[in-house]
Amino acid sequence: MALSHDVVARASALIEAPSVTPATGAVFDVMEAMLAPLGFAVHRFIVGVPPEGPVENLFALRQGPPGSRHFAFAGHLDVVPPGEGWSSGPFAADLRQAPGGALLYGRGAVDMKGSIAAMVCAVEAIPAEAGTISFIITGDEEGPAKYGTVPLIDYIRAVNAVPDFCLVGEPTSVHRLGDMVKIGRRGSVNMWLTAKGAQGHVAYPHLADNPIPRLVALLAELDAIVLDEGSAWFQTSNLEVTDLEVGNRATNVIPAEARARLSIRYNDHHTGQVLVDRVTAIAAKHRTEVRATLHGEAFITLPGVQSALVSAAVEAETGIAPELSTTGGTSDARFLRALCPVIEFGLTNATMHKTDEAVAVEDLTVLTQIYRRIALSALS
């Protein structure tokens, strides 16, 4: 498979390979065809079963001189479903001229096939003797993330290829390329609450047990909790009720069960299990059961060598001194942080997951130069 070395052509080739999560196949063929000619040994493997799988993962390694440092780029090739209402095909990689410069449209242009294309082009300009470089690429970041980066980490450890530093290409920039770098993320835990009672006729409440008042009282108590006031690098933790369901369509029936769902995004004052235990203890007073799923603990790569070299590279190419932040949702950095220090930096996120997702061609070009500077600095 012959591919142009131009960053737009590479981003287009990735976009044109549809890869709605969980991703396998063609898009990884494109990725391998980009990396193999650059001297990378590419290992691909598929794990998982429906509905969360199968998922394809890729680890590519270009070995540097003995004893050299090891820098890794990480990202995902899976994308969210395109939805309706696109002005051109979501996988057409439509390049359009606009008053502010050319834009490349397509699902994944921002999140994050554009960034991955920039990574590849950046590495192409780095000689092998500069050091060891790897790519940690999954097809399961936008989904449950069960069969993606976690088994990749297991493989990397098994082959003794742990990097010294990893950069994740998530779209961290807000208003313009370079204005924000992520050095950590809050933790995330979801909980399902079930209050059980006894069904009955509304005219005979003494023969029933209505679970709704108990669940409402529980939610009110939880909503009133102030978890913390934030910390040095994190915003305030927040608990949000995200669903309330009874499913009772009859006007004269007291339901037997009421359910709710909540999500907590929390900072480094907490762990997920402590929060689950706290909610469970409160729920017990209201005779309500709790089931929880932890999606990742809060983490931070404290400002230091890694953040300094990323910031310096960004400022050298954009003139912007980026803000170091821990805001936003979760990413696979929550897994990679167990492997090595990790920082996230990438394109502007205004159109990610939206209809007509698009990236400025100029941003792709500048991002390539930023990634090249970061890699060279990390290897030096």
Model-based region annotation:
Residues 74-76, 136-138, 167-170, 194-196, ...:
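Short beta-strand segments
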Residues 37-47, 95, 287-291, 319-324:
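Short secondary-structure junctions
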Residues 1-83, 257-263, 270, 274-281, ...:
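N-terminal helical capping/dimerization or prosegment-like subdomains
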